[in-house]
UniProtKB/Swiss-Prot annotation:
HAMAP family: dCTP_deaminase. Pathway: Pyrimidine metabolism; dUMP biosynthesis; dUMP from dCTP (dUTP route): step 1/2. It comes from Thiobacillus denitrificans (strain ATCC 25259 / T1). It catalyses: dCTP + H2O + H(+) = dUTP + NH4(+). The keyword Hydrolase applies. This is dCTP deaminase. The keyword Cytoplasm does not apply.
Amino acid sequence: MSIKSDRWIRRMAAEHGMIEPFEAGQIKQAAGRSIVSYGTSSYGYDVRCASEFKLFTDINTTIVDPKAFDPNSFVEVKGDSCIIPPNSFALARTVEYFRIPRSVLTICLGKSTYARCGIIVNVTPLEPEWEGHVTLEFSNTTPLPARIYANEGVAQMLFLESDEVCETSYRDRGGKYQGQVGVTLPKI
């Protein structure tokens, strides 16, 4: 497997709609102010968080069970930012919609700006031929409230291309998160 460069990312976005909307370079300012950067980097793509969040609350539940997840465990928040309570988490989605090629596995890593503040981004790999908005999970590991900004960079996607195409892709398996839009809760 090899990591793919900015040139490849730009070509795949232009010719195959791999990332929509797409920024060919790094965007570091908006409306005359500094922002957490997003767009194409040397060997990855920095994604943005949309302005819709699901903030975890323990008001309605006593146990978190991935096989019987209660949607009432979240409060919906819309806005330019979301404040995550101490030792809690929020779900969001990327602004960008992804279409992953059959020979590619995509890994998501958090941006250092957030990591240095105790905010961890968790996303599982984007498998070959998966498509959709990426659901992002932000964990606030600090004892203080933490802010996440919408429409600014929050994580980086790295594209790894295999030297051999997989026999069965995520689409072939009928993956349960295929084509997801919006913030998607756990499914069984």
